């Protein structure tokens, strides 16, 4: 068997956005792949029809698409190129029976979504920029004024609201999404939603007479991004907008689905703060009355961690009045259905269903099953694509050995990967990998970095401590960071060492990112059992995180279970920086300079404290990267990151 190489993630092809045609005779999806030489990702559209799979496009930048009709796909692209600064968006159409893609629509603003209408017109979700709200009209003078203003003020940032930046972007500058109507004959856009309100979660009714959407007032200093969004609808004949249902503290709307005879609302009662899972409610289309439909209290969608995904797709869909949805339960994500107020499993296997579509009783699921990267499967669970067979052929893929234990009054679930060429009685070093979130899970899925370490001769252990997803109230860790979760992790580490005497307790290493980075920082201040640690995109100080993260004020107070004023001492007690003078473990810190979720100052603080106390430390910073470095960062940066962590552990082996 050959080992998994450090750059083997570049050989993985990631699938996403699987979508049936209107009549269900074909399906389109995206396939993405990292390109090490060009240090980028390429994405193409693929077609599944009559049991055959073939590439539909070859430009390498196609990811956003929809069906125009049964035989034509519309996708976003830029095949013309721009000689001057431009906000223009272009969409192309391509026939499924062959031929080249043709330019179909050109919009004067950035467009993220289009919804084709039967009359040939479109609904369009596009960007609005404060002070230049009429850019959608295509006035060249206004476009020039926008870019002149941008250039004149490029040395300044004027901040007037929270948050002022978002991870993966830059300073928000107040830009937001609006809903427009596109007249195909006139080639013109008409604004449907008022300026100053951000549109999201747009869904078009099956009869195309009404469009539903969530709306958030972004004209205020602190928009309620985490307070749920109000649901509205517009009658397309009259263009009249109507409030459907409002969010409130005990009814925080996460999303919704359009059924045949009722609208299904997924909303949380806030019992466990901002991470509270949803229950289901029925909303009458005529009266707008809301009634409870089903108590659920589990996660909608997959929160199973993985580093070989690229792209998204549908996590739920109504078929008549039956909701099909992905849900994270325990250590995996499967497909379930809600019918007549009762939830039941549809297709649940070890691993993760990442997205799906359903049409005329047929289903296609994009899933991480059988310790393989993503493939498509049908409604019976039969695999229908083989994109990653060649990548895995002849390679050692460690199979997860489940390890569950009782810690206090609850169970902790986890897994162990054995090193390549494992021999009983021989000693092997161990890497303990801690997930982020904390409301996510590790599961039995193909995880490149873990497989790479197993191929290099390490045991890899990982688990889901208190605070993890998939078990209802188990995820409630508000005000308890560094207590029960730390105890769970140490208990799991002890249990793993007890199960496999081949694990070398003198060569025990630990790493984690985001919440896992917080926990790494906490661990080194509370135990010396690890020979070396690597803290990635971490939190070290809740009192400063409050003011620098894009989610700081909301997330820090929610997770610390208090308000920073007057309870600053509680925030400090839960901060790893408080215990930095206790650290003896050699620690590597990795941060991305454009990570605004766990900003780089968190790494600076911990690194400075350790160096000041004479602890061996190293800080590695990545330009042009954000919080997603390990999952979707530039390929060469991902390789450097993994080399840094692995090299740090190799350097400190006893």
Range-by-range predicted roles:
Residues 387-506, 513, 547:
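Cap/lid segment of the alpha/beta-hydrolase catalytic domain
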Residues 37-42, 82-88, 170-175, 222-229, ...:
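Short, solvent-exposed loop/turn segments at conserved positions within beta-propeller repeat blades
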Residues 465-654:
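Active-site-proximal cap/loop segments of hydrolase catalytic domains
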Residues 43, 128-180, 225-230, 278-281, ...:
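Predominantly five- to eight-bladed beta-propeller fold
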Residues 27-31, 73-77, 123-126, 211-215, ...:
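Residue position within the beta-strands of beta-propeller blades
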Residues 1-14, 47-63, 85-87, 94-110, ...:
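Multi-bladed beta-propeller domains
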Residues 16-19, 156-160, 165-166, 170-178, ...:
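Non-catalytic accessory segments flanking enzyme active sites
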Residues 19-26, 64-72, 114-120, 202-210, ...:
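Blade-terminus and WD-like Trp-Asp/Gly-His loop motifs, strongest in beta-propeller folds
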